[in-house]
Each structure stands twice: as C-alpha cells, then as structure tokens.
Design a protein with these regions (language model features):
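N-terminal nucleic-acid-engaging modules of covalent nucleotidyltransferase systems
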Residues: 1-156
Length: 157
C-alpha cells in the first residue's frame, strides 16, 4: 500500500484500487510521468561510524549540494514538468532548467531525481540555497532572474 501511495500521491486512487482489485491491484500501480512521486531522502547520521552502521559497508557517498531537490518528468511528447520535494510544479519558474533537460537528456519518457543548484556566472561558484529559493516562488521577471541566477542540475543515480 505504501508503494502505491509513493508513486501516485493519491489516497483515493490507492483506496479504490485496494477495494476493487486487492493486493494484486496495488502491486500493479506504477509511476507515470506528470505525477510527482515521493522523493527518497537521505538518512541523517551524526558520525561516519553511525552512517556505516546504518547502511553497511561498502557505501556510496555523494557530495551534498546546497540547492533544491527537483524531479524532471518527460512525458513522451517532449513536455518537461519540474516538481519540488514538496511535489509543487515549478516548471514556469525554471524554463532554463526545463530546456536544459529537454536538450541534454535522451529518452522518450522519463523521471529524473536531481538537485538544482544556483551559481554565480562570473565566478562559477555555487550560491547558497537562500539565493535560489527566490526563484521557486517567483511569478514575474522569470527571464531576468534566470539570467541573473542560472542553475545547473546534478542528477542522482
């Protein structure tokens, strides 16, 4: 049941499927482009020792970017939809990011899990999350903001 909810975010659909088709029906529910899915979040540990106790050895360790989590969905018709960790559609606020994904990621239909990070065009250095968060809620002046505060996308495996 949890898996069905994670890939639909629709309690009503999960309940209806469970009632009509039972466990077999729930197991048949799968991800669909355009419908955001719950994102897997990193486990927090106080020490490296605690981290290894939690996940075991060997373990893959990735750099922590100070950006925001993004899901990029491509629907098979060259439409890109971007969702935040809270499952909000932010495609309009990040046309540059949507365009980048469309031009650089091959595939007819997909869902990518990534971190979008703002950077300073002059220095190439990453900007803190607080800077890029201005773009998330932006409704006007998006083109100018895209020029002043570009973002790059770091895709998770």
């Amino acid at each position: 049941m949890q898996h069905a909810y994670d890939v639909t975010n629709e309690f009503a659909e999960v309940a209806k499927t469970a009632k009509l088709k039972g466990l077999e029906g729930l197991e048949s529910i799968s991800m669909k482009t355009g419908i955001p899915i719950q994102m897997m979040l990193a486990l927090k540990c106080d020490t490296i020792e605690e981290a290894f106790e939690t996940v075991g050895k060997p373990a893959a360790i990735e750099f922590k970017y100070d950006g925001f989590r993004i899901q990029a969905h491509k629907d098979g018709k060259n439409n890109i939809i971007l969702f935040t960790r809270r499952l909000e559609d932010v495609t309009n606020q990040f046309p540059d990011l949507a365009d980048f994904v469309l031009k650089n990621v091959k595939g007819r239909s997909f869902i990518l899990d990534a971190e979008a990070v703002g950077y300073d065009k002059k220095t190439g250095k990453y900007l803190p999350f607080q800077s890029i968060s201005q773009r998330i809620k932006r409704k006007y002046g998006i083109e100018k903001m895209s020029e002043e505060m570009p973002v790059e996308v770091n895709v998770f495996d």
